[in-house]
């Protein structure tokens, strides 16, 4: 069989247990579940980062964030042009490449954003195209598409919809982290992305090698689900929230302020006094119905995309579905990713259908999102660059799975080995350093911080030594905040934007 066409489908901030093939009872993903019936379902897949940009740059390069420098959504962490990436390496093999939807390979200059105005985005678009995409339909996150003129925002503007969408997302006082999408469903960002992908697939030639990345920005907040999809979700079939009333009495935990307030993380921003403890149970029901409704919308488009790809390419098709990271989804009474290192955020769905595969398999071995870069390149007949920190999924499974997992973002890192995880964060501006340990064998829901339990002293030494064996990790993740000002990307005016690599003229 010739080199396969490759369809890479990703979502943003999707909890593992939103798919029935991963045990969800809400029944919102019939198309993905049908794919899983004839594919490899990886039961223990972890993201390399609990936030968007580092996770996505790892898809592109197969590198740990502390090796690529892409460690944050907000610091000097753009995807460098010096590293070979999926697009550049596949193009060398004759592939036509495309991305439809969210890139987020460059930190957004958040201080420059305005709720009442959409700003130009051409420097982002130019940079993305330097990464090797032959075709780009950019819908660069639900918020970014209202702050900046990407392709989706331009389409909203042409149809007179942009101002209303911007108001609902950023100015409407009734927006509490969720709202009903104010226009017809085809203009919802995830439907828009799905339609662009289908149109592109239908225009392709089956005689060419094609790599198409469909990158949905949902179900990431704001949860802007069309009412027709929210109405499909029976609150009595929602996954039960996992929480304990007294779990945040322990102030040794990193997210204690997010719960008690005033927190600065996503879910806290919509809560009274910045405290997520103030959300009522009805709030959680309404937020979660819309979250699952957004997933139902995406699933429909996944079905349409798969139908189009199979009609065009037949069985010579590699399909990979995953998410950049998970979502708290009300567990531990938090929503958002929050830079959290709970399993809710670190575990990701991963479904892989090889060309011609007709039977489903459950793969229990532990793998990382680092494995996707070498897997895709190897299937395309491309050599894997030496910089890659992962190996193919098949190789990792043959080795018995990853012996340990590291996941990181700009100020936090976690290491997981033998079901025990140790978490560290850089000392914050008040000098507080949170350290946490959870034993998933005894405490699978992660309620009890056992870092100071003497029974785990040896485990802490072992896992800390593994982290210290990564000097770049210790430098980038644990650099004191006082040293961080020189790599903040924006001076607050939008003029101080700096790239990690060459800036396009």
Where are these regions (language model features)?
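Short, charged, surface-exposed hinge/linker loops at domain edges
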Residues: 476-496
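Short hydrophobic beta-strand that contains or immediately precedes a catalytic carboxylate
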Residues: 437-438
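Formylglycine-dependent sulfatase
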Residues: 1-425, 431-433, 444-465, 493-505
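Residues forming the ATP-binding cleft of Hanks-type serine/threonine protein kinase domains
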Residues: 441
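A contiguous, mid-protein "functional segment" used to position or interact
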Residues: 454-483
């Amino acid at each position: 069989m010739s080199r396969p066409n490759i369809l890479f489908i990703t979502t943003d901030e999707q909890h593992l247990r939103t798919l029935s093939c991963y045990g969800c009872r809400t029944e919102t993903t019939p198309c993905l579940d049908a794919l899983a019936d004839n594919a490899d379902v990886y039961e223990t897949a972890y993201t390399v980062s609990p936030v968007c940009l580092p996770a996505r740059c790892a898809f592109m390069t197969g590198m740990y964030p502390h090796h690529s420098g892409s460690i944050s959504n907000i610091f000097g962490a753009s995807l460098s042009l010096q590293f070979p990436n999926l697009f550049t390496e596949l193009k060398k093999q004759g592939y036509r490449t495309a991305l439809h939807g969210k890139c987020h390979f460059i930190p957004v200059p958040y201080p420059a954003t305005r709720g009442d105005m959409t700003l130009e985005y051409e420097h982002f678009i130019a940079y993305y195209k330097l990464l090797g995409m032959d075709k780009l339909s950019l819908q660069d996150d639900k918020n970014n598409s209202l702050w900046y003129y990407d392709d989706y925002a331009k389409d909203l503007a042409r149809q007179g919809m942009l101002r209303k969408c911007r108001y609902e997302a950023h100015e409407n006082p009734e927006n509490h982290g969720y709202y009903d999408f104010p226009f017809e469903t085809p203009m919802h960002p995830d439907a828009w992305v799905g339609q662009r992908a289908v149109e592109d697939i239908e225009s392709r030639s089956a005689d060419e090698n094609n790599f198409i990345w469909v990158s949905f920005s949902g179900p990431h907040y704001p949860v802007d689900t069309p009412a027709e999809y929210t109405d499909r979700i029976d609150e009595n079939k929602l996954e039960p929230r996992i929480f304990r009333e007294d779990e945040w009495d322990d102030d040794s935990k990193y997210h204690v302020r997010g719960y008690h307030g005033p927190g600065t993380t996503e879910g806290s921003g919509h809560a009274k006094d910045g405290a997520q403890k103030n959300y009522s149970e009805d709030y959680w029901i309404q937020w979660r119905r819309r979250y699952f409704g957004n997933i139902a919308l995406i699933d429909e488009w996944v079905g349409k995309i798969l139908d189009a790809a199979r009609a065009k390419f037949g069985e010579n098709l590699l399909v990979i579905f995953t998410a950049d990271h998970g979502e708290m989804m009300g567990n531990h009474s938090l929503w958002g990713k929050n830079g959290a290192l709970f399993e809710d955020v670190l575990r990701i769905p991963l479904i892989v259908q090889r060309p011609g595969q007709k039977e489903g398999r459950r793969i229990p071995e532990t793998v990382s999102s680092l494995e996707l870069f070498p897997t895709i390149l190897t299937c395309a007949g491309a050599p894997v660059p030496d910089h890659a920190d992962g190996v193919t999924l098949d190789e990792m499974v043959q080795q018995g799975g990853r012996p340990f997992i590291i996941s990181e973002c700009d100020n936090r890192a976690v290491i997981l080995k033998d079901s025990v995880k140790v978490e560290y964060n850089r000392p914050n501006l008040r000098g507080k350093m949170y350290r946490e340990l959870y034993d998933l064998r005894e405490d699978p829901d992660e309620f009890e911080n056992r870092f100071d339990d003497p029974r785990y002293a040896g485990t802490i030494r072992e896992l800390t030594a593994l982290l210290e064996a990564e000097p770049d990790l210790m430098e980038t993740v644990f650099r004191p905040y006082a040293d961080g000002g020189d790599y903040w990307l924006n001076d607050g005016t939008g003029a101080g934007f700096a790239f990690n690599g060459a800036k396009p003229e």
